[in-house]
């Protein structure tokens, strides 16, 4: 298996996971080392034609991977270092990748951030992905990276109580102090990139929250979030991301 990515977000060219969409719309994730490509050819020039909105959404998928991996409760210092470096690269270059699509330096660093996020998330992800996997099964087909961008601010706020030092390490990359300021910085980044301000803009209303929370509790990423969320916690995070 040879993988040649044409976006910079998922990082599946170095990952051992796959997603199957079931007949009822649910997304089933599974892992196998047999899924890891033998060779990954990561050429940033293949992303030059990616439209700005898709560049932004896939780029924020990479950001979410790096943040959630870094905050995950599993102990893996090498993975943390890779994720942290990937986040630094993404934040330095995502704006330019969106505004200057043929800027090779920006595209190269976003492709690296994407790959690094996936290399590191073998450690585990968290509540952002528990929710986005559940939301991704909706008939309207919301984009995974866009969902992650919208959900990330409230999830980092929720997780601060469990891992305050790690949340501050992420906040340091954004140049702010504390989870509240970090959440605001992520929202500001989403705004600059032209992404939705909340779930409502994506057609996702409060009537869906309870069912989404139920599915999030069953997701494989739920167990590796640094602070275990209850059904009510998930509903609250969705409401705060509206």
State where each predicted segment sits:
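Short glycine/threonine-rich catalytic loop with a Thr-x-Gly-x-Asp
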Residues: 55-60, 79, 83, 141-146
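A glycine/threonine-rich phosphate-anchoring loop and its flanking beta-alpha core
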Residues: 1-77, 166-169
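Gly/Pro-rich interdomain helix-loop hinge
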Residues: 138-141, 145-208
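Glycine-rich phosphate/diphosphate-binding loops and the adjacent beta-loop-alpha structural elements
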Residues: 68-122, 133-137
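Short alpha-helical scaffolding segments that buttress acidic/His motifs in well-ordered protein cores
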Residues: 63-67, 110-117, 131, 152, ...
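Short, amphipathic C-terminal "tail helix"
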Residues: 205-242
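Glycine-rich phosphate/pyrophosphate-binding beta-alpha loops
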Residues: 9, 115-145, 219-224
